[in-house]
Amino acid sequence: SVPPLSAPLVRKTFKKYLGKFPEEIYDSFTPDALNAASIGQVHCATKDGKKLAVKIQYPGVANSISSDLALVKPFATRMFNLKGKDSEKYFIEVENKLLEETDYTLELKQSIAMAEACKHIPNLRFPIYYPELSSERILTMDWMEGQHLSEFTSKNTDSTKGNKIGQTLWDFYMYQMHHLRQVHADPHPGNFLIDENENLMAIDFGCIKKVPNEFYVPYFELADPKTINNPILFEEKLYQLEILRADDTPEEIVYFTGIFHRLLRLFTQPFHGDY
């Protein structure tokens, strides 16, 4: 785990990126972090009667990403049996997404846009974000009171409440995928909270993945019974999605086609009948 930023370093970060010290910006500010974020830490503040969460990025994160990935790349190539020069695009994708997560100005923009686009979904809440209190390394939003999703699921025994949360998650991601054609690509339980009324609260939109048509169309055609039940068509879609590649061996083609066929048949079963 990364050691928390000291109070003097927190003050220095504010002065550098917002031009003022925290006590000049907020009515109150906790000098010590209350929570950890993926690449930073979260402080509590108040301003104009509102309780706020202030996320501050650890220094040097953005600068270390490329060098760290260069060290990991040889091991990942062997571990995941990545072949050919085309594997480079996967590393570029990972690097670009990690760098995007270090840009809190981008996260601010994406968070506001996602909250606005999905505000109609029942039982789903988002914090309000404050551009005037944010920068490329500092992000200020409403403090959201609630249990983390993992804590809720470990303690909850009420199926009605669980179904309500599950339905909200489903509605949220289906709307993103099929209407926005982009998804919140960091959906671990720490990025979801449950309030006292069993509303789902979604936070941390630093990683958003746009879904291009050339992926969307063949991916969801895989769920069509006509595709699943047609071996030639099914294999064609796997090639379109680069699950199968031209340089795969006959053994690899048989192996991966079989795995994905079994998974897709099982996964799509609830959509092909009444249960």
What are these regions (language model features)?
Residues 226-231:
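Conserved phosphoryl-transfer catalytic core
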Residues 1-168, 172-174, 194-199, 205-213, ...:
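Broad phosphate/nucleotide-binding scaffolds in NTP-utilizing and phosphate-metabolizing enzymes
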Residues 218-221:
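Short amphipathic alpha-helical recognition elements used for nucleic-acid or partner binding
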Residues 179-189:
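Catalytic-loop of the protein kinase fold
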